[in-house]
């Protein structure tokens, strides 16, 4: 498995998101090229991608978002998406473990995530990797 940090939005990266986002959610459209370029330029985010071997098509992605707050650096694991054709083959685990490594290297004191309860395999993966249920309310304010 080849994991890499996305630093430029190539046609391959753009097309991967057009294919992968609908596999995650139907609530939002796939990002535009400008959205993805803003993501990789944003200082607080790291976009990772996975392919089976270097140069082969992208089969998974994950985003690490970091915020610096008075209580320290906090990490969030966002939008882990593995292509349906390769689920269950360790791609999600590899991406998540790499995000954990990067969060540690960046000085984060924790890494949080949310996962839809219907995504049973993903929830089992996160628990197997050591994520614990965080007893708090999560609120969202749509802007």
Predicted region positions:
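Conserved acetyl-CoA-binding loop of GNAT-fold acetyltransferases
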Residues: 117, 127-135
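Hydrophobic adenine-recognition pocket in adenosine-nucleotide-binding enzymes
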Residues: 80-82, 115
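Conserved acetyl-CoA-binding loop-helix of GNAT-fold acetyltransferases
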Residues: 82, 88-101, 124, 128
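Short coil/turn motifs at secondary-structure junctions
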Residues: 67-69, 85, 118
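Conserved beta-strand-loop-alpha-helix junction that forms the acyl-donor binding cleft
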Residues: 87, 112-122, 140-143
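Conserved GNAT acetyl-CoA-binding A-motif
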Residues: 96, 103-115
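Acetyl-CoA-dependent GNAT
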Residues: 3-72, 78, 96-98, 133, ...
């Amino acid at each position: 498995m080849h994991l890499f940090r996305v630093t430029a939005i190539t046609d391959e990266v753009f097309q991967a998101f057009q294919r992968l986002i609908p596999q995650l959610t139907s609530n939002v459209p796939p990002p535009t090229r400008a959205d993805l370029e803003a993501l990789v330029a944003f200082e607080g985010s790291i976009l990772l991608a996975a392919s089976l071997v270097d140069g082969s098509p992208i089969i998974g992605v994950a985003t690490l978002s970091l915020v610096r707050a008075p209580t320290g650096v906090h990490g969030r694991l966002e939008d882990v998406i593995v292509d349906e054709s390769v689920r269950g083959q360790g791609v999600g685990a590899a991406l998540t473990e790499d995000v954990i490594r990067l969060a540690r290297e960046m000085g984060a004191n924790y890494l949080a995530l949310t996962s839809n309860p219907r995504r049973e395999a993903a929830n089992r993966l996160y628990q197997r990797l050591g994520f614990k249920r965080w007893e708090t309310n999560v609120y969202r304010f749509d802007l």
